[in-house]
From Swiss-Prot:
Belongs to the sea anemone sodium channel inhibitory toxin family. Type II subfamily. It comes from Radianthus crispa (Leathery sea anemone). The keyword Plastid does not apply. This is Delta-stichotoxin-Hcr1d. GO terms for cellular component: extracellular region; nematocyst. Its main location: secreted. InterPro entries: Anenome_toxin (IPR000693), Myo_ane_neurotoxin_sf (IPR023355). The keyword Disulfide bond applies. The lineage of its organism: Eukaryota, Metazoa, Cnidaria, Anthozoa, Hexacorallia. Keywords: Disulfide bond, Ion channel impairing toxin, Nematocyst, Neurotoxin, Secreted, Toxin, Voltage-gated sodium channel impairing toxin. Binds to site 3 of voltage-gated sodium channels and inhibits the inactivation process. A synonymy between H.magnifica and R.crispa is controversial. Disulfide bonds join 3-43, 5-33, 26-44. It holds the Pfam family Toxin_4.
Amino acid sequence: GNCKCDDEGPNVRTAPLTGYVDLGYCNEGWEKCASYYSPIAECCRKK
């Protein structure tokens, strides 16, 4: 599903970021967002 990142999350490289939920490594209670357009643009956001 889609997700939008913001500056509050750890590992923010590009924010705000619109992309998809990636089952990557984020802290418990967070989910990873990955950009549709850039493989290096990702961040974690609170669930």
